[in-house]
């Protein structure tokens, strides 16, 4: 039976085995999907051993995405742009192909919620790996402007310069933010620490869409804050998790699974339905 893994540290909390098992059942694919939690300095050895022993593909999560980028034999265009790899496939000719499905998963989830991206003004909070992975897929949807805000302004400026060939990308400090945004995406991990980005509530209005890449069994702090100031549409990253997994499954198996029922099952599993 074809074997797949998710590599991370920590990774015991991962919902990837649950999701991919449902995808396999739905598409009648025979495979098994497990967890691997190597020490940070043992990732390369463990990854190579997995493929040497017949592994077909894997997902890679924190803190290994940048290491995976350096270890694979070839990169998809979107992985090159993201500077990180979250999906690896062993091709028929023995090549380890690195891909990044995070941004595609984000865009698919936004669209499933009816969020219009073309012609919109988007604010992206954070300039780390999650933001980098999201930029090219978001800009491919042709927003009028994408603004990056980050506590360290230089990081936002660097990211904006790197992606300016794909669209109108601006780097601003949190204090400089103004005007009306149609969508705010929080790519920071602030919600995991129970914290908020230093954002003015004046940016929140009834018609704005709010998206937090983090998720939990309750509203994240960022979503709760946005709702408190009048945001009517606020979404967490659970749908992105399922959509990026569907994209990875498609890369591996050549068949695209449906996501709606799997997301429903996952919410039930987490106790959020």
Curated annotation (Swiss-Prot):
Domain of life: Bacteria
Reaction catalyzed: shikimate + NADP(+) = 3-dehydroshikimate + NADPH + H(+)
Source organism (scientific name): Aeromonas salmonicida (strain A449)
Residues the entry annotates as binding NADP(+): 126-130, 150-155, 213, 237
Family named by the database record: Belongs to the shikimate dehydrogenase family.
Single Gene Ontology MF annotation: NADP binding
InterPro entries: Aminoacid_DH-like_N_sf, NAD(P)-bd_dom_sf, SDH_C, Shikimate_DH, Shikimate_DH-bd_N, Shikimate_DH_fam, Shikm_DH/Glu-tRNA_Rdtase
Subunit structure: Homodimer.
Binding site for shikimate: 14-16, 61, 86, 102, 215
Protein name listed in UniProt: Shikimate dehydrogenase (NADP(+))
Pathway the protein takes part in: Metabolic intermediate biosynthesis; chorismate biosynthesis; chorismate from D-erythrose 4-phosphate and phosphoenolpyruvate: step 4/7
Role played: Involved in the biosynthesis of the chorismate, which leads to the biosynthesis of aromatic amino acids. Catalyzes the reversible NADPH linked reduction of 3-dehydroshikimate (DHSA) to yield shikimate (SA).
GO biological process: amino acid biosynthetic process; aromatic amino acid family biosynthetic process; chorismate biosynthetic process; shikimate metabolic process
Enzyme class: oxidoreductase
NCBIfam families: aroE, PRK00258.1-2
This protein's GO CC annotations: cytosol
Entry keywords, A to Z: Amino-acid biosynthesis, Aromatic amino acid biosynthesis, NADP, Oxidoreductase
Gene name per UniProt: aroE
Catalytic activity, EC: 1.1.1.25
Active-site residue numbers: 65 (proton acceptor)
